[in-house]
Regions:
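A short acidic, Gly/Pro-enriched loop at the edge of an enzyme's catalytic core
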Residues: 27-42
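A short glycine-rich, Lys/Arg-flanked "PGG" loop and its adjoining helix->strand segment in the class I
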Residues: 57-70
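Conserved Rossmann-like nucleotide-binding pocket used by diverse enzymes
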Residues: 25, 43, 75
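Core SAM-dependent methyltransferase catalytic element
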Residues: 92-93, 97, 105-138
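Class I SAM-dependent methyltransferase SAM/SAH-binding core
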Residues: 1-31
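Conserved beta-strand signature within the Rossmann-like core of class I S-adenosyl-L-methionine
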Residues: 71-78
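Short alpha-helix
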Residues: 9, 13, 81-92, 117-120
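A short SAM/SAH-binding and catalytic strip from SAM-dependent methyltransferases
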Residues: 40-55
Length: 138
């Protein structure tokens, strides 16, 4: 974990031997500062649940969709709202939506800890052909 600190994330990358291949940037997940179709993959780890409003979480998912290239993949690991994320990705036209969970022991710990021990990942793939969000709205 990096504690949401870019310097810690860069140190983790250095320890893994990949620091020269990454750039750390802090941004609002509801308004990402990247052009449309910039990335092959988007990875979010224990972040989106921090948006307390479902509409704001939906905006974050829309931003993930916007910055993904066609056929790009999103991996969203979080401690709650998994069904909401899967439904949101489906509304955005993602395919191959999967829930990747933990072992029964970890699931039990999650149940008694209100989810704090068991992030579940939602994986989804952006369709290879799509219409941009901006084109649909205007």
């Amino acid at each position: 974990q990096s504690g949401n600190r870019p310097d810690a994330a860069l140190n983790n990358a250095r320890l893994e031997g990949v620091a020269e291949r990454i750039e750390a940037q802090t941004a609002d997940m509801r308004q990402l500062p990247f052009p449309d179709q910039s990335f092959d993959a988007v990875v979010s780890h224990w972040a989106v649940h921090n948006l307390y409003n479902a509409d704001e979480r939906a905006t974050a998912l829309s931003e993930m969709h916007r910055v993904l290239k066609p056929a790009g993949q999103v991996i969203l690991a979080d401690i709650e709202h998994h069904a909401e994320y899967a439904a949101g990705f489906a509304r955005l036209g993602f395919t191959d939506i999967q829930h990747v969970g933990a072992s029964p022991k970890t699931a039990f710990l999650s149940a008694i800890s209100f989810g704090s021990f068991c992030p579940t990942a939602v994986l989804a793939r952006k369709t290879a052909t799509h219409q941009s969000t901006n084109d649909r709205n205007g």
